[in-house]
Design a protein with these regions (language model features):
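Beta1/beta-strand and adjacent pyrophosphate-binding region of the FAD-binding site
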Residues: 184-196
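Short, solvent-exposed loop/turn and secondary-structure capping segments
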Residues: 92-95, 149-152, 164-167, 203-205, ...
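Bacterial Sec-dependent N-terminal signal peptides
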Residues: 1-6
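Extracytoplasmic
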Residues: 7-183
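Conserved N-terminal/central alpha/beta ligand/cofactor-binding core
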Residues: 205, 211-212, 217-296, 339, ...
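N-terminal Rossmann-fold NAD(P) dinucleotide-binding loop
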Residues: 199
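Flavin (FAD/FMN)-binding glycine-rich loop and adjacent Rossmann-like elements that form
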Residues: 177-184, 225, 287, 299-302, ...
Length: 624
């Protein structure tokens, strides 16, 4: 129910928005610039802040090439410049932010430095420019290479600055840019949302069993955490009893090299893409984020997805869906019961669970590395804005690894951009300290910060509840179930903030440690792979039906790939029998078992998945 006060506020906003129209204003989204220059399209946070945006990810070096576009101004006049941006370091520092840029109109700066004020996305009021009706150029000129960001620019003759309200932002967009046209892309047997390892495997398995499949991926690269954008290696074991044929599919797409934070080629993005493109039954939609769900009763009927440049929307209908988003975005929008955080010990009698439930999760790793070259280089000193480091708190390493982990105390969905930003903030601050103030800085004279990811490597967020919730004691006793499927092989691997790091940086920790609880190889119940609330939705990946503790084993990527393969098979069983995912458990499980015995992967390709199969290496292991 909407209150009278909310109606009053909304009415006032509508009146204000109406001041800006196509007769006195022009709006351009940064992601629609004709030439984006060296700026990066950033689409991770569409569901949080309403849009994709351009990011100046120069790793401390100002971008060489501006983003430039042409706009048509409606009339002669004095135009106010408004820019939707934010001060991304203000969460942790009141000093001058490094994430700044200029806006140039017809080659001339309007005299304002953008990205300096609010920690939230807001409309920063810029200068005034005299313009004649007709075409003019707008350019975004980065000043630092430290991740300044721009979502949109408005030129208006009205003296009005919009609020931070997302509702008002959407109204402005519609008033100045029109209502987006949604292109209907047809209906599919199986719609997979999320193109990480689990989503790829789900789509491939279903396709090879004859289903018409749509695979929707919000990035322009497949692979999720195992892509060149995030650079986390695969972990876990495949081809294990009771269904040893499960895993050959993952072998087809998995890189043949171990390691976190290595060169882009290490993660073999093309290998994944080429296997998917070879499947005639798969329609691949890259760069699309699902933003709306249409339901029919308790089933999903269709989804609407927004393309990353914000120019196109598509509608995809389906008979069955799988949430492989990691964050459970599809299930959450569809109304499925989700959990996030740690369950209380008493709820499931899990010995490793905390006494009281809380919101803590395992965190995000922002991978980065530096390299020693033969040429000296400098790097800006972050003293005025960076993390406060000294000889005792700095980690003078050349490469981040799994234990560089942020955001454990934050909301992994709502605070996703802040968490990502803090990971970059720590990386920049660490390298800057080593280059400029460290007692051994002479060892860093020729060290270059080569790569910092701007894409979050997530471990945990929402989990969708199924007909069964996997618990700690299922894994440790173990307790076997009649609906056994693929096998999890990783120990229960729980991460916590390092005590010293918590003391030095309370609620802003960035170093973690792992607690490993041994398990026998364990076959996961099928009932963890479909929603108890949405009658036609599966899930595969880290958002399956498990407790926080059990997730410590099931979340690693090879295991997620096995789950995806099983889910693709289950979708095929559903399609053949006009059944629901639950019906597969109650009526058609023998059909699924037959498919699992056969597998869907090829055995005539080189087998490369020998590395990092079972974690026996303790605290400083990779890929955790």
């Amino acid at each position: 129910m909407v209150s009278a006060q909310q109606v009053e506020v909304r009415t006032k906003q509508n009146i204000n928005v109406m001041k800006l129209n196509t007769l006195n204003s022009v709006m351009v989204l940064a992601t629609t610039f004709a030439d984006k220059g060296d700026w990066t399209v950033e689409q991770q946070f569409v569901l949080q802040m309403g849009s994709s945006y351009l990011l100046a990810h120069g790793i401390g070096t100002p971008l060489a090439k501006d983003a430039v576009t042409t706009v048509t101004v409606p009339c002669d006049g004095e135009y106010n410049v408004l820019v939707r941006t934010k001060n991304w370091t203000k969460h942790w520092s009141d000093g001058p932010t490094p994430g700044i840029f200029e806006v140039k109109i017809d080659g001339q700066s309007d005299g304002v430095t953008y990205g300096t004020d609010s920690v939230n996305w807001y409309w920063q009021k810029g200068g005034k420019v005299s313009l004649t009706a007709g075409e003019h150029t707008i350019a975004l000129h980065d000043l630092t290479g430290f991740d300044g960001r721009c979502d949109a620019v408005i030129l208006t003759t009205e003296d009005y600055t919009p609020s931070e309200s997302l509702e008002e932002y959407f109204e402005l967009r519609e008033a100045l840019l029109g209502t987006p046209v949604v292109e209907d892309k047809g209906s599919y047997d199986f719609v997979v949302v999320g193109g990480g390892i689990s989503g790829i495997c789900a789509a491939l398995a279903a396709s090879r069993l004859g289903l018409k499949v749509a695979l929707i991926q919000d990035r322009y690269v497949l692979g999720g955490n195992n892509s060149s954008e995030v650079r986390v290696g695969l972990g876990g074991q495949i081809n294990i009893d009771p269904y040893p044929s499960l895993g050959y599919l993952l072998n087809e797409i998995g890189p043949d090299r171990i390691g976190n934070a290595r060169g882009a080629h290490h993660y073999q993005d093309d290998k994944k893409l080429n296997v998917v493109l070879a499947e005639k039954n798969i329609s691949l939609f890259m760069g699309y984020t699902v933003i709306e769900v249409e339901k029919s009763g308790d089933a999903i009927a269709s989804v609407v997805a927004q393309e990353a440049t914000m120019q196109n929307r598509i509608k995809i209908s389906g008979k069955y869906f799988s949430d492989c988003t990691g964050d459970a975005h599809l299930g959450y929008m569809a109304g499925a019961e989700c959990r996030m955080g740690r369950e209380a010990r008493a709820e499931f009698n899990e010995p490793l669970a905390p006494e009281k439930a809380d919101d803590m999760t395992m965190g995000v790793s922002i991978e980065w590395y530096c390299e020693d070259w033969n040429t000296p280089c400098t790097f800006p000193d972050s003293l005025d804005w960076g993390l406060r480091l000294d000889e005792y708190t700095v980690e003078p390493v050349h490469r981040a690894n799994w234990y560089w982990e942020v955001g454990m105390m934050d909301d992994q969905v709502a605070d996703a951009e802040k968490i990502r930003d803090y990971g970059m903030y720590v990386a920049y601050s660490t390298f800057s300290y080593c280059k400029n103030r460290y007692s051994k800085k002479e060892d860093w004279i020729c060290t270059h910060l080569t790569w910092v990811s701007h894409v979050s490597g997530k471990r945990e967020s929402r989990r969708i509840m199924g007909d069964y919730i996997l618990r700690e004691q299922d894994l440790t006793r173990p307790i076997h179930h009649e609906d056994e499927t693929c096998t999890t092989t990783w120990r229960i691997d729980q991460h916590y903030p390092m005590e010293k790091n918590s003391k030095d940086y309370p609620n802003q920790e960035w170093l973690s440690y792992g607690v490993l609880t041994p398990i026998d190889f364990y076959a996961l119940p099928y009932r963890c792979f479909y929603s108890k609330d949405i009658s036609n939705m599966f899930m595969a990946g880290r958002n399956i039906s498990v407790t926080h503790i059990a997730l410590g084993s099931t979340r690693v990527m090879r295991t997620c790939g096995l789950i995806g393969e099983v889910v693709g098979m289950a979708a095929a069983v559903c399609a053949r029998n006009n059944a629901t995912p639950r019906d597969v458990y109650t009526t058609y499980f023998e059909d699924l078992k037959e498919l699992m015995r056969k597998g869907t992967g090829r055995t005539d390709v080189p087998y490369t998945q020998f590395y990092h199969q079972v974690d026996r290496t303790g605290h400083q292991a990779e890929d955790r």
